[in-house]
């Protein structure tokens, strides 16, 4: 059997052979120290053209964190690796420290990656087994139980984990052989954290009883990943048929699916939008409280910073925008008006809606969220605002996002949608053409 050095080099060649720019997540601990040492040797022995960079994240959670940066800097200087560090602030109020720290790390990785550069991290076989058990604890399905893939799409590039098939014990042997120095994070002994609890108390028992357990758990994770990939392939065409150009999901076709297929399609719809996978309970609530709500209702269900809404027999993922109902903007129509909340800007242009020029005593303002009866050009009778929006096909969540042009207290137009009869000019009077340049609406 090949020694650990040879096996690791073969793994690196398989995963990294074609990549010339590599960013390494470098904590200074055992795992990432082994990974960086391997990459440096691989660069030196096999491909001098490789651009190797290391990034260290200062989480601000340990009094020794500043010393760890110095340690990592010295290692990188000695190994001739370009070194970067970044400080992050951890907000553990919603997710807990472990998840919040991980999210913060990967946000830094995402912002630090350069063009054509791949990210390489040092998770190993024991990490994979722990991740599998944590997913099992949460009641995850195949997608969660698949744990960490060795290669994944990340930030328009790839995230590679070349050590996933190697145990911590093997990495320790490699580090000892090459006399590596690494950081020991004392917080790893705090079993209040779930992963540490597994590592300190559960994994030793499992390994003592079944020495093959980490490999078996990793194999199960891999099989779950294969099942999830197969489902993706089988459901891809169905999902394409259900999703509209606006990213909404058709309810009628979903209704004839089995519950299992419907839930699988709903999960993939969330994935299509880059959202976290919903739980079984959330899927049930989404279907029965939103999709199947009574026809005259305007149901919504919150998912993080988004709401799932129903409109025209489709499900929509809608950002939770700030209310603009109380917003009143003065507008000197000679100048461009920048709208709030990234809605774009208004100006006088060659194309757009036409309205009369305001009188000298008329104050021009932009408001949001009209209520009451409205009489628009092209309609004989006035309509209540809610009824009018419905007739014009404007989704409920967009109605408060459309700029309303007022002269004094008189509604003149909803930009891009309608003009009222009060917008019409007397014969011979000048007209203005107003344009709404939209940057974000849906």
Curated annotation (Swiss-Prot):
Gene field: tilS
UniProt GO molecular function: ATP binding; tRNA(Ile)-lysidine synthase activity
Keyword Nucleotide-binding belongs to the record: yes
Entry EC no(s): 6.3.4.19
Gene Ontology cellular component annotations, sorted alphabetically: cytoplasm
Subcellular location(s) per record: Cytoplasm
Job description of the protein: Ligates lysine onto the cytidine present at position 34 of the AUA codon-specific tRNA(Ile) that contains the anticodon CAU, in an ATP-dependent manner. Cytidine is converted to lysidine, thus changing the amino acid specificity of the tRNA from methionine to isoleucine.
Keyword ATP-binding applies: yes
Amino-acid positions noted as binding ATP in the UniProt annotation, renumbered to this chain: 27-32
Family membership noted in the UniProt record: Belongs to the tRNA(Ile)-lysidine synthase family.
Listed SMART domains: TilS_C
Pfam family for this entry, one: TilS
Top-level division of the source organism's lineage: Bacteria
Top-tier EC class: ligase
Major localization class: cytoplasm
Record remark on domains: The N-terminal region contains the highly conserved SGGXDS motif, predicted to be a P-loop motif involved in ATP binding.
NCBIfam families: lysidine_TilS_C, lysidine_TilS_N, PRK10660.1
Gene3D superfamilies tied to this protein: 1.20.59.20, HUPs
Keywords assigned: ATP-binding, Cytoplasm, Ligase, Nucleotide-binding, tRNA processing
InterPro entries tied to this protein: Lysidine-tRNA-synth_C, Rossmann-like_a/b/a_fold, TilS/TtcA_N, tRNA_Ile_lys_synt, tRNA_Ile_lys_synt_N, tRNA_Ile_lys_synt_subst-bd
Catalytic activity: cytidine(34) in tRNA(Ile2) + L-lysine + ATP = lysidine(34) in tRNA(Ile2) + AMP + diphosphate + H(+)
Protein name: tRNA(Ile)-lysidine synthase
GO BP field: tRNA modification
């Amino acid at each position: 059997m090949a020694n650990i050095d040879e096996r690791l080099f073969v793994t690196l060649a398989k995963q990294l052979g074609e990549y010339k720019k590599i960013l390494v997540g470098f904590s200074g601990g055992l795992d990432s120290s082994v990974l960086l040492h391997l990459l440096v040797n691989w660069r030196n022995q096999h491909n001098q053209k490789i651009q190797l960079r290391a990034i260290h994240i200062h989480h601000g959670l340990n009094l020794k964190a500043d010393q760890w940066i110095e340690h990592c800097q010295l290692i990188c200087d000695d190994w001739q690796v370009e070194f970067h560090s970044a400080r992050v602030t951890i907000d553990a109020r919603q997710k807990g420290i472990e998840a919040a720290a991980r999210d913060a790390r990967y946000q830094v990785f995402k912002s630090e990656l350069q063009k054509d550069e791949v990210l390489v991290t040092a998770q190993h076989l024991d990490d994979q087994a722990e991740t599998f058990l944590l997913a099992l604890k949460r009641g995850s399905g195949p997608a969660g139980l698949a744990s960490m893939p060795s290669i994944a799409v990340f930030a328009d590039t790839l995230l590679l984990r070349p050590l996933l098939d190697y145990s911590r014990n093997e990495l320790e042997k490699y580090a000892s052989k090459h006399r590596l120095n690494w950081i020991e994070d004392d917080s790893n002994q705090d079993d209040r954290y779930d992963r540490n609890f597994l590592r300190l108390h559960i994994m030793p028992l499992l390994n003592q009883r079944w020495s093959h357990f980490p490999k078996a758990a990793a194999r199960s994770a891999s099989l779950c990943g294969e099942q999830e990939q197969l489902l993706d392939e089988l459901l891809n065409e169905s999902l394409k048929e259900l999703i509209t150009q606006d990213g909404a999901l058709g309810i009628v076709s979903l209704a004839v699916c089995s519950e299992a297929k419907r839930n699988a399609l709903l999960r993939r719809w969330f994935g299509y939008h880059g959202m976290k996978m919903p739980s079984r309970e959330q899927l049930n609530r989404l279907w029965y409280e939103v999709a199947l709500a009574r026809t005259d209702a305007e149901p919504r269900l919150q998912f993080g910073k988004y709401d799932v809404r129903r409109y025209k027999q489709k499900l929509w993922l809608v950002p939770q925008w700030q209310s603009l109902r109380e917003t009143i903007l003065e507008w000197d129509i000679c100048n461009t008006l920048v709208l709030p909340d990234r809605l774009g800007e208004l100006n006088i242009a060659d194309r757009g809606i036409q309205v009369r020029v305001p009188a000298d005593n008329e104050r021009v303002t932009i408001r949001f969220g009209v209520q009451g009866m409205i009489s628009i050009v092209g309609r004989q009778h006035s309509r209540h605002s809610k009824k009018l929006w419905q007739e014009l096909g404007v989704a409920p969540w967009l109605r408060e996002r459309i700029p309303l042009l007022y002269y004094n207290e008189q509604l003149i137009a909803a930009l891009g949608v309608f003009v009222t009869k009060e917008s019409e000019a007397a014969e011979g009077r000048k007209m203005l053409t107003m344009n709404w340049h939209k940057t974000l609406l849906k």
